[in-house]
Amino acid sequence: DWLKFAAVVAQLAILSLLVVAFNVETQAFRYVLALSAVGFVIHHLLPLRFRITFFGLLSIVALIVAFGVEGAWAEAVWLLGLGGLLIGLAHVPIPFLARIALIVGTTGGLMAMRAGVFPAPWNGLLWPAFGAMFMFRGMIYLYDLRTNAAPFSLSRAVAYFFMLPTVCFPLFPVIDYKAF
């Protein structure tokens, strides 16, 4: 089993070196790839009960690194804050339809900001990442929350919404929360 793991780590290291050597993608991508490679090894070595929390934290660090490379630290903070707000609204202890109304109202305000009706305190770099992380995943999350289809925790929600590849790949496929 360790031999297979070593082979995967070697392939990941070679891939990382090739991406740097041939200047593939952006600097943010290269940093996130290096972070992912190191994170992969740590994640594999951790006991199972710590892995989802570690993945969530790794994803947040990747988001901060990717936005920071672009000089957009404030946007990373805004993205984390807005994401935390939406996750929090999904769990407010009020009737489910009232939670949906709060989320629809909040996202309606965000849509108005995106359309330029109201000024947003961040630049345009935030919107693609925010949409990729919350648009479709939010609907899946709310459905699974309503039907109790999967276990829910803050660690799992953070790992699900801020999932590491999404910060560099806004068109990353939608992941089913139950299968996550």
Whereabouts are the PLM-identified features?
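Residue-level signal for well-ordered alpha-helical segments
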Residues: 10, 19-23, 30-31, 116, ...
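N-terminal membrane topogenic signal
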Residues: 1-10, 27-28, 44-50, 94-96
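Alpha-helical transmembrane segments of polytopic membrane proteins
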Residues: 2-7, 27-35, 71-79, 128
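Short hydrophobic/aromatic-rich motifs at helix boundaries and adjacent loops
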Residues: 9-14, 30-33, 53-55, 151-152
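Intramembrane catalytic core of multi-pass membrane enzymes that act on lipidic substrates
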Residues: 53-180
